[in-house]
């Protein structure tokens, strides 16, 4: 009897497994051909809309998939629609095939069984994701991803200022308060539930909290008032010195950018480290604009795409999600003039050609280096979002 060496058995099993994996993906590609994917995603940025249009053209030409960008203002409205479809027992032929999502919205979809999956382990490009150095690709606002959404890009809160208008910038929220008191009317932030406004108050809360520990656990109603007291105390001090004396707030980062350009405010914000450089290149902001983060860091996270449970084009959605993770698509997304959205890939896992292309990416004049952006504060538990927004509106939106 011939004994097969153990190493050959291992190699044989690996080959069989790889073939099965490859065959499954080829079947997905075949089924995706001719499908129409309704991609529900925020439509408030022209450059992002253009990028999505480019990506849609690529999968149309290569795979025969039609991607329709359904521009939405608040992805929470889409979740409400999916909940209604589930209540009506519409388990197939849903109105949404793919959605841009993260944080509390992902948590809500996961808890209400509105997600298709797990699926990301089936995507060939998933193996290129930097799961080692980017923990937020695996944990979304403390909610385990569990292969139920595919990482798309990275984000970190940055502040924008015009170096021609101010000689220094604050390096903490306490310094921002002092800055506002010294420059009345020149500081503001968007009103929650604007994503930017909610992020701003979360940043405040993380900086002024007596202890951060409760913020990384689900909200306890009995402890909410005590835990958030330092936040409201800080905002009560800040608002009288803000733009329009804190009686009115901007709608989002784009409006803040315009106010910064007009000289009405001295500090704006963004969740894209390349945003200011893009704005300079597009003529939206002067060349003297620069960016910074706080001394102890700022909130950072990952944004994802997810497939609803009743998608009528699950295969097409998976192929599109896989393309969005390709080195080609991630590189283009990282170019400042295109979007400037940081990659979720581990560049060291890429081919020499792709690695070189990422290394040659231009760093805009107002863009912080990776070393300068290395202090990332993890998002609080997703349950804090709704609780903070509700209390903020009760206090200040009268």
Specify the residue positions occupied by each region the protein language model found:
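Short, polar/charged alpha-helical segment
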Residues: 25-33, 40, 45-66, 159
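Conserved C-terminal helix/tail region of periplasmic/extracytoplasmic solute-binding proteins
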Residues: 24, 258, 365-398
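Bacterial N-terminal signal peptides
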Residues: 6-17
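Extracytoplasmic ligand-binding site segments that recognize negatively charged/polar headgroups
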Residues: 42-54, 70-79, 92, 96, ...
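Extracytoplasmic/periplasmic substrate-binding proteins
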Residues: 243-306, 310, 356
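Short, well-structured alpha-helical segments in soluble
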Residues: 82-91
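Mature extracytoplasmic/periplasmic domains
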Residues: 298-299, 303-372
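Boundary at the C-terminal end of the N-terminal hydrophobic targeting segment
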Residues: 18-22
């Amino acid at each position: 009897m011939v004994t097969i060496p153990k190493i050959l058995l291992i190699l044989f099993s690996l080959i069989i497994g790889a073939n099965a994996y490859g065959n499954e993906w080829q079947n997905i590609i075949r089924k995706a051909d001719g499908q129409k994917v309704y991609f529900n995603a925020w439509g408030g940025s022209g450059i992002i809309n253009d990028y999505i249009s480019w990506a849609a053209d690529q999968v149309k030409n290569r795979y025969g998939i039609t991607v329709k960008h359904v521009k939405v203002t608040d992805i929470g409205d889409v979740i409400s629609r999916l909940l209604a479809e589930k209540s009506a027992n519409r388990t197939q032929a849903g109105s949404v095939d793919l959605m841009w999502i993260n944080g509390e919205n992902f948590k809500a979809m996961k808890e209400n069984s509105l997600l298709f999956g797990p699926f990301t382990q089936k995507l060939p490009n998933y193996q290129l994701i930097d799961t080692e150095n980017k923990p937020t690709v695996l944990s979304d606002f403390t909610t385990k991803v569990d292969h139920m959404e595919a990482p798309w890009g990275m984000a970190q809160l940055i502040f924008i200022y015009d170096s021609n208008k101010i000689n220094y910038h604050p390096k903490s929220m306490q310094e921002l308060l002092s800055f506002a008191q010294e420059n009345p009317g020149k500081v503001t932030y968007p009103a929650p539930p604007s994503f930017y406004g909610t992020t701003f108050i979360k940043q405040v809360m993380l900086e002024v909290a007596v202890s951060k520990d409760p913020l990384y656990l689900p909200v306890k109603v009995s402890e909410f008032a005590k835990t958030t007291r330092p936040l409201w105390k800080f905002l009560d001090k800040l608002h009288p010195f803000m733009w329009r004396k804190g009686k009115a707030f901007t709608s989002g980062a784009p409006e803040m950018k315009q106010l910064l350009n007009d000289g009405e405010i001295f500090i704006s914000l963004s969740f894209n480290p390349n945003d200011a450089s893009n704005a300079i290149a597009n003529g939206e902001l002067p060349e003297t604009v620069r960016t910074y983060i706080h001394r102890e860091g700022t909130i950072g996270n990952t944004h994802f795409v997810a497939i609803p449970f009743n998608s009528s084009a699950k295969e097409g959605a998976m192929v599109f999600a896989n393309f969005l993770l390709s080195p080609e698509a991630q590189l283009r997304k990282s170019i400042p003039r295109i979007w400037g959205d940081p990659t979720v890939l581990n560049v060291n896992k890429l081919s020499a050609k792709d690695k070189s292309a990422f290394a040659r990416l231009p760093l805009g004049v107002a863009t912080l280096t990776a070393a300068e952006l290395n202090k990332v504060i993890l998002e609080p538990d997703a349950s804090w979002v709704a609780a903070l927004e509700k209390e903020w509106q009760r206090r200040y939106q009268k």
